[in-house]
Amino acid sequence: MPMPPDDSPLSLLPDHPLAAHNTFGIAATARYAARITHAAQFEALHRDPRVASLPQLVLGGGSNVVFTRDFDGVVLLDEIGGRRVVREDDDAWYVEAGGGEPWHAFVAWTLEQGMPGLENLALIPGTVGAAPIQNIGAYGLEMKAYFDSLIAVELATGRSERFDAARCAFGYRDSFFKRDGRGRFAIVAVTFRLPKRWTPRLGYADVTRELDARGIAPDAATPRDVFDAVVAIRRAKLPDPRVLGNAGSFFKNPVIDAAQFDALRARAPDVVSYPQPDGQVKLAAGWLIDQCGWKGRALGAAAVHERQALVLVNRGGATGVDVLALARAIQHDVRVRFGVELEPEPVCL
């Protein structure tokens, strides 16, 4: 995304509090923070002697991070905004958004512009730049389905690079940027390919039930209907992080092979599962946690949400260590009872 040049020195905020920059609302402090509004500022970091030798952390909405300690480095607050149609052909629109653009606002904008496709991903917290890192997904859709490419800056060199889907190596809630590329790049712009022929994604019962409750037959649903249904479902199930600190779903839904699933089903016939195209089986992590009796329980100021067992919350004053201790206790109980490993979605620092 073209950005105006910015040759001014980076403005550093010393001893910057981070509670307002993570959706858990966990108190932590960064040695420095800097607000990044232009790609050129990322590109110049490696030449700035004040920060070049320090650890660097790029933060968007802070919806996928748990701070267990202060950050002894510079936190780069990605505020690169903007959204535009960069081109279109007979089949699709190619839409670009800045890395710091709020994700939900971007999804709503695409609908307002008559370019549907992302509506199942409505109300997911965070920014556009964070979406490819996590390969966000919900209600039968992963971001990678509409991903075209992104521009990222390598922090150590200031070099801008283009990544296509193959280079991003997307997996389930995973990508190159969570593995080999972790901490190395800042995503400054993402381009999505939105087909002009809309294909509704209505494979999840929650969505069709919500449509039915609104008197809308699935085969008559519009993109706006699906968007509104998903927003209503998420608001009913998930706490607002502005009111109750959380990072959305804390654990990935585990994927196991067929043999392991057969053994598990023999022990737990009611296990909630979703067959995958490759023969593996995805399990509902929330069901596993609920069966272990964790829904609504707390360890100190960290707790499992009373309506959604996948969501861990900060009841007020919880530290990252508190959240991590709760997560580990849940992992232990699920492992002992079901022989299944739960993997956290957020990055714990």
UniProtKB/Swiss-Prot annotation:
Catalytic reactions of this protein: UDP-N-acetyl-alpha-D-muramate + NADP(+) = UDP-N-acetyl-3-O-(1-carboxyvinyl)-alpha-D-glucosamine + NADPH + H(+)
Main EC class the enzyme belongs to: oxidoreductase
Domain FAD-binding PCMH-type: 25-197
InterPro entries, alphabetized: FAD-bd_PCMH (IPR016166), FAD-bd_PCMH-like_sf (IPR036318), FAD-bd_PCMH_sub1 (IPR016167), FAD-bd_PCMH_sub2 (IPR016169), MurB (IPR003170), MurB_C (IPR011601), MurB_C_sf (IPR036635), Oxid_FAD_bind_N (IPR006094)
Residues the record marks as active site: 173, 249, 345
Required cofactor(s): FAD
Signal peptide residue numbers: none
Pathway(s) this gene product operates in, as recorded in its UniProt entry: Cell wall biogenesis; peptidoglycan biosynthesis
Protein EC: 1.3.1.98
Biological role stated in the UniProt entry: Cell wall formation.
HAMAP family listed in its UniProt record: MurB
Protein name: UDP-N-acetylenolpyruvoylglucosamine reductase
Organism annotation: Burkholderia vietnamiensis (strain G4 / LMG 22486)
Gene name as annotated: murB
